Swiss-Prot record:
Disruption phenotype: Deletion mice show augmented T-cell responses upon immunization demonstrating that TIGIT acts as a negative regulator of T-cell responses. In addition, tumor progression was slower in TIGIT knockout mice than in wild-type mice. GO terms for molecular function: signaling receptor binding. Residues 35-45 are annotated as: Homodimerization. This is T-cell immunoreceptor with Ig and ITIM domains.
Amino acid sequence: MHGWLLLVWVQGLIQAAFLATAIGATAGTIDTKRNISAEEGGSVILQCHFSSDTAEVTQVDWKQQDQLLAIYSVDLGWHVASVFSDRVVPGPSLGLTFQSLTMNDTGEYFCTYHTYPGGIYKGRIFLKVQESSDDRNGLAQFQTAPLGGTMAAVLGLICLMVTGVTVLARKDKSIRMHSIESGLGRTEAEPQEWNLRSLSSPGSPVQTQTAPAGPCGEQAEDDYADPQEYFNVLSYRSLESFIAVSKTG
């Protein structure tokens, strides 16, 4: 009795070991790039790599969220959904090439492998669509353009103000110099004009230098005549006066 139970137990162990070996032999794995990124307007490859020693792939389904993208069948080949027929191209291998990406293409993508006798295997990929480098550069230039324009406008305004102040200062200086020169001209002209008017006026006395007259009303011809001559003339005239008086007497 105990021998029979031992035999059954050994047979069970052998069957369990054989079953475990069979399951291990048919088990497979899927490797994917869990997170990928691409630029808007560009393209990206969605790829799931299935590996197994004995299992064979019979069908592969590709979905975006819950929306079918494409199906591959060993018997029927590829079929791409009409909605994505202009942007989805089968390959390489059992993957897909997604073209003309938009920002709305960002999201989760699933690959489902149907195998025999291994069963079904699933993989997940998250795609992030980013703005293209040209758009980013254009946005950066657009953002820096107003700053550059503002700086140029400020510098232009400063230069204009400096130029205006310089012109006004020069004009004010010129006006001041002209006023000073005009004032000096009037100051110099007024005495000359007054003298000319005084000389040309009929009633104004004209000062002339005359030699002093002698005792008999005759003007001395020479202020610096000899004193002896002057005395002789006086004596002669006095003598003539005395003779005239004697004759009348």
